Structure formats: structure tokens, C-alpha cells
């Protein structure tokens, strides 16, 4: 077991999370900066999220207050209007947000056909899968075991449809990760911050 000093010296530390919410599209109008969880965006004085700028992430946003409803994963970058952060195009409502903890360089996830980790399964290690069908997995996804890393699952192939944040842990039923139906057809890793060049960490030469 490495000591705290060794752990801190052995890998770069993430920057503090930072996201800016603008009331209007294209980063116009009244704005508010967040550095931590926000259970109700309206309490910050922002009536409606028209655009989002993520300066250090990743984050997850929710359709409803108190982190409920449809989920939206935000990684470092610009989101000039609502349809740039929703892959379902079902709602333009963004009411609460929280930072996502990315604490592992390795990624391993197991998806199961039935609840309680039974039935046919598909194991994914350190890879993004845009289509489960192309990998020969035709089944529904009713339970998930995330052994390492942080992932986002999608309702449809090609990273489309409803998004489901999958953090380390066990999800015995699809409702545990917020899915109305046991339908997940693509999945990708969240590799932001210190381990991915797209993230907020910039190594020194």
C-alpha cells in the first residue's frame, strides 16, 4: 500500500472542478460559476441554462433539481446550446449539477442481461464500445458492475439517446443507474482530467 506522499508524487493531481452556466445560448447573458455540487441551479440566480462552459471537469448535470431525471455528462469544453449536451434531444431542462470523481486510470465494466448480475454478460476493459451488437452482444442490460474507472452508457448505438453515468460500484437493476428500461447499447470511458490529454491537466516538460 503506497503512502499518501508516494501516491501524490506518483500521479498528477486533478485541478479543482469548474463549470460556468450561462442563461443564453453562445455564452451570453447572466452567468454563474460552480466549483462543487449544485442541487438547484435556480437558487444561484440562473433561471435557465442556455449554454455551458466546462473549464475543469468532468461533471454530470440533471434534468430536475436534486440530481434527478435525465442525466447529461459534461467533459472539458464548450456547449453553446442545449442540444450540444443532450444526446436524446428530449428536454432542454438543466436544473442541478455535480462534479464527477475520476480516480482511476484503468477501466473495467461488466454488463449483465438480467438483474442481480445474472444471465449473459459482456466484459469491457480499457475500451470504448460504440455498438454492443457489433461485438455480438444482443441482450438487454439489466445490471452493471463497474470494477474500475468511470463510464457513461447510452440508450442507443453511437453514443445516442439517454445517458447513464456509471461510477465504480454495483447496479443490481437498470433503475439503479437511472434507466427507465434495461436498454444500453453503447458505452464509453470518462477519461477526463489528469489522465487524458483532452482533460484539464497539462504536464510540465
Swiss-Prot record:
GO terms for biological process: lens development in camera-type eye; visual perception. Residues 193-205 are annotated as: C-terminal arm. The modification N-acetylalanine is found at residue 2. The keyword Acetylation applies. The keyword Repeat applies. Residues 2-16 are annotated as: N-terminal arm. Residues 17-56, 57-101, 107-148, 149-191 form the Beta/gamma crystallin 'Greek key' domain. Keywords: Acetylation, Eye lens protein, Repeat. It holds the Pfam family Crystall. PROSITE patterns: CRYSTALLIN_BETA_GAMMA. Residues 102-106 are annotated as: Connecting peptide. GO terms for molecular function: structural constituent of eye lens. Homo/heterodimer, or complexes of higher-order. The structure of beta-crystallin oligomers seems to be stabilized through interactions between the N-terminal arms. Has a two-domain beta-structure, folded into four very similar Greek key motifs. Crystallins are the dominant structural components of the vertebrate eye lens. Belongs to the beta/gamma-crystallin family. This is Beta-crystallin B2. It comes from Oryctolagus cuniculus. The gene is CRYBB2.
Amino acid at each position: 500500500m503506497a503512502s499518501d506522499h508516494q501516491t501524490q508524487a506518483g500521479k498528477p493531481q486533478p485541478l479543482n472542478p469548474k463549470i460556468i452556466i450561462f442563461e443564453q445560448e453562445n455564452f451570453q447573458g447572466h452567468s454563474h460559476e460552480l466549483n462543487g455540487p449544485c442541487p438547484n441551479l435556480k437558487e444561484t440566480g440562473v433561471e435557465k441554462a442556455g449554454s455551458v462552459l466546462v473549464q475543469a471537469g468532468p461533471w454530470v448535470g440533471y434534468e430536475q433539481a436534486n440530481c434527478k431525471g435525465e442525466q447529461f455528462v459534461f467533459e472539458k469544453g464548450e456547449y453553446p446550446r442545449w442540444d450540444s449536451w443532450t444526446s436524446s434531444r428530449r428536454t432542454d431542462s438543466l436544473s442541478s449539477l455535480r462534479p464527477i470523481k475520476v480516480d482511476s486510470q484503468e477501466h473495467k465494466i461488466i454488463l449483465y442481461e438480467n438483474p442481480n448480475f445474472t444471465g449473459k454478460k459482456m466484459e469491457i476493459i480499457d475500451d470504448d464500445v460504440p455498438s454492443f451488437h457489433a461485438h455480438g452482444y444482443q441482450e438487454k442490460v439489466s445490471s452493471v458492475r463497474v470494477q474500475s474507472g468511470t463510464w457513461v452508457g447510452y440508450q442507443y448505438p453511437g453514443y445516442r439517446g439517454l445517458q447513464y453515468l456509471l461510477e465504480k460500484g454495483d447496479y443490481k437493476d437498470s433503475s439503479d443507474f437511472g434507466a427507465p428500461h434495461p436498454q444500453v447499447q453503447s458505452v464509453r470511458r470518462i477519461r477526463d482530467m489528469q489522465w487524458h490529454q483532452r482533460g484539464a491537466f497539462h504536464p510540465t516538460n
